[in-house]
């Protein structure tokens, strides 16, 4: 396990129409990389969202990233008030990242 790096995982679910704003916020906080999965569904405060529903154009978007502890602090400072205004969900957890030739942070 010595080739693993301790990091934080951030997982965010937001409405697709807010994705661009979210990405700008993450980049301003120093994020070097992220993954986006579009048209995700589930059950939340707004009821059930089915990504296969033809009437549901945009849907929700899932964004995940791994970063160091100091980056989490900067991301949370910008993200917390943003989520209160626009809604969404953010989970932060400890994780281990396999060491690779190019770690973006």
What are these regions (language model features)?
Residues 1-105:
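Positively charged, small/polar-rich N-terminal and surface patches that mediate targeting and assembly
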């Amino acid at each position: 396990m010595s080739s693993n790096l301790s990091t934080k995982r951030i997982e965010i679910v937001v409405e697709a129409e807010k994705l661009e704003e979210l990405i700008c916020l993450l980049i301003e906080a120093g994020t070097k990389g992220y993954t986006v999965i579009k048209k995700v569904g589930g059950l939340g405060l707004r009821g059930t969202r089915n990504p296969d529903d033809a009437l549901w154009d945009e849907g929700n978007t899932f964004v995940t990233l791994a970063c160091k502890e100091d980056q989490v602090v900067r991301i949370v400072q910008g993200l917390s008030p943003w989520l209160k205004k626009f809604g969404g969900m953010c989970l932060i957890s400890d994780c281990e990242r396999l060491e690779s030739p190019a770690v973006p942070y």
